[in-house]
């Protein structure tokens, strides 16, 4: 109706394809996002069986991801907004201890730089990963798991954008299974995705 809601939030696009755009949502619209994020968190990470501490390595600002991610997950677990600060994340892990289950979130290039850091022995911590913002390959996920010293670490991609909101889609164990199969079988990959590249 052209009117701003009295309560809600305003996200801003990155401006990568032109001037940044403001996206205005009411609290009612945000409620759907909270429900989707809760499902994603508990379904993909079995969060009801773990004592997660989430370290948010997303960039913070007017964009849809950083601050909003923390606002959502603090309803379901303990969250610290470290932003994309490698030293802060390493310091936080050392301060909070090795007995916790950690979920570290961030963009793929940042996460690779983080886990390449020699400032901590990653293998001594129980870490799962949430990423998004750009695509990742099967090889990238293998590299991250190897860096963590845990071939069973969950490394999940979540999908969204400023205009449609964050976390509207996400990988599951089943979609990862299909992707792995296609990665190993080029014929199957083409039959499923009509391309020679693994998605």
Which residue ranges define each predicted feature?
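Short, flexible, solvent-exposed loop/turn segments with mixed acidic/basic and small polar residues
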Residues: 45-46, 71, 120
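Active-site glycine/GP-rich loop and adjacent strand/helix microenvironment
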Residues: 76-199
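Residue-level recognition of alpha-helix initiation/capping sites
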Residues: 4-5, 64, 135
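Flexible, active-site-adjacent loop/turn segments at secondary-structure boundaries
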Residues: 21, 60-61, 134, 157
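AMP-binding/adenylate-forming
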Residues: 26-40, 52-112
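Gly/Ser/Thr-rich helix-start
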Residues: 16-19, 67, 134, 161
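Nucleotide 5′-phosphate-binding alpha/beta core
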Residues: 1-52
């Amino acid at each position: 109706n052209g009117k701003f809601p009295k309560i809600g939030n305003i996200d801003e696009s990155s401006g990568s394809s032109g001037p940044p755009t403001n996206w205005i949502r009411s609290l009612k619209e945000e409620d759907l996002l909270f429900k989707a994020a809760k499902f994603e968190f508990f379904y993909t990470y079995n969060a009801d069986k773990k004592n997660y501490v989430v370290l948010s390595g997303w960039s913070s600002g007017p964009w849809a991801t950083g601050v909003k991610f923390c606002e959502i997950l603090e309803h379901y677990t303990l969250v610290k907004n470290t932003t994309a600060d490698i030293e802060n994340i390493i310091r936080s892990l050392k301060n909070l201890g090795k007995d916790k289950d950690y979920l570290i979130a961030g963009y793929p290039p940042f996460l690779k730089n983080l886990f390449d850091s020699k400032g901590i022995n990653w293998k001594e911590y129980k870490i799962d990963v949430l990423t998004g913002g750009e695509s990742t390959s099967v090889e990238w996920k293998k590299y991250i798991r190897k860096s963590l010293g845990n071939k069973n670490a969950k490394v999940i991609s979540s999908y969204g954008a400023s205009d449609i909101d964050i976390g509207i889609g996400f990988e599951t164990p089943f979609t990862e299974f299909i992707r792995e199969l296609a990665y190993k079988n080029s014929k199957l990959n083409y039959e499923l995705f009509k391309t020679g590249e693994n998605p």
